[in-house]
From Swiss-Prot:
<feature type="transmembrane region" description="Helical">
    <location>
        <begin position="145"/>
        <end position="165"/>
    </location>
</feature>
<feature type="glycosylation site" description="N-linked (GlcNAc...) asparagine; by host">
    <location>
        <position position="29"/>
    </location>
</feature>
<feature type="glycosylation site" description="N-linked (GlcNAc...) asparagine; by host">
    <location>
        <position position="13"/>
    </location>
</feature>
<keyword id="KW-0325">Glycoprotein</keyword>
<keyword id="KW-1133">Transmembrane helix</keyword>
<keyword id="KW-0472">Membrane</keyword>
<feature type="glycosylation site" description="N-linked (GlcNAc...) asparagine; by host">
    <location>
        <position position="48"/>
    </location>
</feature>
<feature type="glycosylation site" description="N-linked (GlcNAc...) asparagine; by host">
    <location>
        <position position="39"/>
    </location>
</feature>
<protein>
    <recommendedName>
        <fullName>Uncharacterized protein L536</fullName>
    </recommendedName>
</protein>
<feature type="glycosylation site" description="N-linked (GlcNAc...) asparagine; by host">
    <location>
        <position position="135"/>
    </location>
</feature>
<feature type="short sequence motif" description="Cell attachment site">
    <location>
        <begin position="109"/>
        <end position="111"/>
    </location>
</feature>
<keyword id="KW-0812">Transmembrane</keyword>
<dbReference type="GO" id="GO:0016020">
    <property type="term" value="C:membrane"/>
</dbReference>
């Protein structure tokens, strides 16, 4: 993938907190409700799992990814919060896409709060993004086309260079 990877823990923590705030308190409220109703050993076992967080900056957009068991995931709440939805539509879309969550786990946020994340893989993330017609989606599509064009140009340039080498030999 072309873009910038951000590994700085402070930037990741700030981004994660601000993305959770975009979700109108839903992430924190759901986490608190779930935490009250389950055995705390479930939370502790999830927190002991190794989950790496990374930000991927692609064009003007930032994505927070969670790396677990050799796979990349993102929080469904974060993706839907980028779609300019009203609170009612946000909740409706969450209910629609919850069955596609690949993984749910407790992850410690930078401010010390345990958050119950509903994680989706990159394929599901792309499917969700492309199913909307928001400013974010239009920007995402334009940036994908731009990067594909750059890759195409680089491949054609390599073919041209190889043809020159072949002619000279």
């Amino acid at each position: 993938m072309y873009g910038i990877y951000i590994h700085d823990e402070l930037t990741i923590n700030d981004t994660e907190l601000s993305m959770d705030k975009l979700c109108s308190g839903i992430v924190e409220n759901q986490s608190k409700c779930i935490a009250v109703s389950i055995n705390s050993s479930n939370i502790i076992s999830d927190l002991n799992m190794s989950v790496r967080k990374i930000i991927y900056k692609f064009g003007t957009n930032r994505y927070l990814f969670y790396y677990y068991n050799s796979k990349w995931y993102t929080d469904i709440h974060h993706i839907l919060s980028l779609m300019d939805l009203s609170l009612g539509s946000f909740i409706s879309e969450l209910q629609k896409y919850y069955p596609e969550c690949d993984l749910t786990m407790w992850i410690l946020r930078g401010d010390g709060m345990c958050i119950h994340r509903k994680l989706i893989d990159l394929e599901t993330m792309t499917k969700i993004i492309l199913s909307f017609n928001s400013n974010f989606t239009r920007c995402f599509k334009a940036e994908c086309i731009y990067h594909m064009a750059i890759v195409y140009i680089l491949i054609m340039y390599q073919i041209y260079i190889l043809s020159l080498i072949r002619i000279n030999t």
